[in-house]
């Protein structure tokens, strides 16, 4: 997708190109030092000679487009969803020349007609992406988004006709937050020109009950993300290593990417709804940091008495490392 996708066959071209650049750099350096010729003169001469090669010309074009794409991508906001503003469902279609499109009308704005600009929709919001036809125009990487509301595909990457749909039914918390990231990106980078009267807006341009429901799910996902961030600070993930016979988990003062003053001991942290677990490093001395009622009665057991924790089988309660048997 626009933010982070590259065609797989680009990897081979990149490898060849980097090898060529390395060889060219060595050659230019040798010529400059041996014959006291300026760097720019040598480069321009070699460029003229190599322009006769179709591979060289195509590689230059590929590198130029890749650099342009990279600069386009770095403008996308970082994915710290809890810091992004909530999506405002209200779009004033009566002001600023905004329009209410039917899905059929929006289809005419897929970039294939010279008489019409290129539009796309996400969560029913229609954006003018005509200024970036190198991405959204016919035959380009993201043309499948043009002329339609393909909200679901922005996060699933399913570009079949069944996947290029507006529905968000069944999407996970992370996928819903990804959609919010995309809306934030398009709000910042492209003009909002209207809405599409379909799943998220009615024929008067007013938000539907479906949009209200989706935004409520997005907010719930955001709260879940915040709670996860807090949980990671309280119960950092364990270090781990695995092989065909099993593996081991252990704790350190930097395990899970969370730097702290204590290492802790490994425990199963149970998610009560799904009963799934992950390995967590648990503070095992002094006052607890989780705030759970069960740990407040002890002043020197850390969070060991938290109700969502279990011991690993055949592992000492005081051990800093536990074996995992496959």
Curated annotation (Swiss-Prot):
Q: Which domain of life is it from?
A: Eukaryota
The chain positions of domain Cytochrome b5 heme-binding read 98-197
Which cellular components does GO assign to this protein? endomembrane system; extracellular region; membrane
Tell me which positions the record assigns to the signal sequence: 1-34
Matches recorded under Gene3D superfamilies: Cytochrome b5-like heme/steroid binding domain
Annotated localization? Secreted
What Pfam families does the entry give? Cyt-b5 (PF00173)
Q: List the disulfide bonds.
A: none
Q: Does the keyword Secreted apply?
A: yes
What are the record keywords, sorted? Secreted, Signal
Where is it chiefly localized?
A: secreted
Q: According to its UniProt record, which protein family does this protein belong to? A: Belongs to the cytochrome b5 family. MAPR subfamily.
- Primary role: Heme-binding protein.
Domain text from the record? Answer: The cytochrome b5 heme-binding domain was proven to bind heme, although it lacks the conserved iron-binding His residues at position 136 and 169.
Q: What is this protein called?
A: Neuferricin homolog
Tell me the organism's taxonomic lineage: Eukaryota, Metazoa, Ecdysozoa, Nematoda, Chromadorea
